[in-house]
Amino acid sequence: MVREEVAVSTRTLQWKCVESRTDSNRLYYGRFVLSPLMKGQADTIGIAMRKALLGEIEGTCITRAKSEKVPHEYSTIVGIEESVHEILMNLKEIVLKSNLYGTRDASICVRGPKYVTAQDIISPPSVEIVDTTQHIASLTEPINLCIELQIERDRGYRMKAPNNYQDGSYPIDAVSMPVRNANHSIHSYGSGNEKQEILFLEIWTNGSLTPKEALHEASRNLIDLFIPFLHAEEQDIHLNLEDNQNRFTVSPFTLHDRLGNIRKNKKEIALKCIFIDQSELPTRTYNCLKRSNIHTLLDLLNNSQEDLMRIEHFRIEDIKQILDILQKHFGIDLPKNKRF
């Protein structure tokens, strides 16, 4: 029998941004390419990435509003052009940016006549308003308007519960989706066994993060989903045949469990899979690193202590915390100076 030789590409898989633009404060666009891929791989990656972009990325939004002396959602207030329902819909559209966890309170307290915009929202320091010009209400008379707001960080779309509140508190449909849309297309080239594909990925965001940031976060979320399948040992899988023959649970895969992978082959790949937000770093330190495009442990180890001290707002205490974590969990030291 004659064995047919199969040609396999030895080129490194690469991606790059081929187009990036800001259409408005609340509409960013980015176009990316990934190549070379084997036949069928582009569709596999494109479908998974689109789902992750639209459903796995967290966003921040207003989820509840409260104002006294409002009988019901569809009532009107003398001196305000919009109905209560219209004001709630305007609040729903406000684009926020934050790294908060849990619930935060905000408020609006103004006096008319006034054109009320997102700029009038008094929010916590951890919450940033992306477009301060977004319209909320128009006060046509000298009246006071005070609204208490609840802000949450979540993912996807959450329908508000039926409103049975009598205290002027109204839930708002939570749309925690920073990515407005995502499309992928495929270009094939070559022939026979050498046929390859290029994946084109288009991303539109609401301005709370860039398309590149969205692509990075979606990729990270996909990696986190698949890591348990890569590393879970047979003894870590607990079958519960008594309750349900088709159900099994996998032990949580913690940061500590990944340490063995670093000392194995493919060390660089393992380092790429460990993101700095999975460590014990304080929020301020994490945000400083993220702003400097340091997202993974590999990114961090490509810098020296001297490099980190050049980061804006970085302190010597932050360096010590990073060194302690690297030594404690990984047995790795960060050089003081860049080695050439």
UniProtKB/Swiss-Prot annotation:
Region annotation (Alpha N-terminal domain (alpha-NTD)) ranges: 1-233
GO biological process: DNA-templated transcription
CDD domains: RNAP_alpha_NTD
GO molecular-function term, one example from the UniProt record: DNA binding
Keywords in alphabetical order: Chloroplast, DNA-directed RNA polymerase, Nucleotidyltransferase, Plastid, Transcription, Transferase
Cited Pfam families: RNA_pol_A_bac, RNA_pol_A_CTD, RNA_pol_L
Entry keyword Plastid: yes
Top-rank EC class of the record's enzyme: transferase
Keyword check for Protein transport: no
Record region (Alpha C-terminal domain (alpha-CTD)): 266-340
Catalyzed reactions: RNA(n) + a ribonucleoside 5'-triphosphate = RNA(n+1) + diphosphate
Subunit annotation: In plastids the minimal PEP RNA polymerase catalytic core is composed of four subunits: alpha, beta, beta', and beta''. When a (nuclear-encoded) sigma factor is associated with the core the holoenzyme is formed, which can initiate transcription.
Similarity field: Belongs to the RNA polymerase alpha chain family.
Domain notes: The N-terminal domain is essential for RNAP assembly and basal transcription, whereas the C-terminal domain is involved in interaction with transcriptional regulators and with upstream promoter elements.
Functional note: DNA-dependent RNA polymerase catalyzes the transcription of DNA into RNA using the four ribonucleoside triphosphates as substrates.
NCBIfam families found in the cross-reference section: rpoA (TIGR02027)
Name of the molecule in the record: DNA-directed RNA polymerase subunit alpha
Organism: Calycanthus floridus var. glaucus (Eastern sweetshrub)
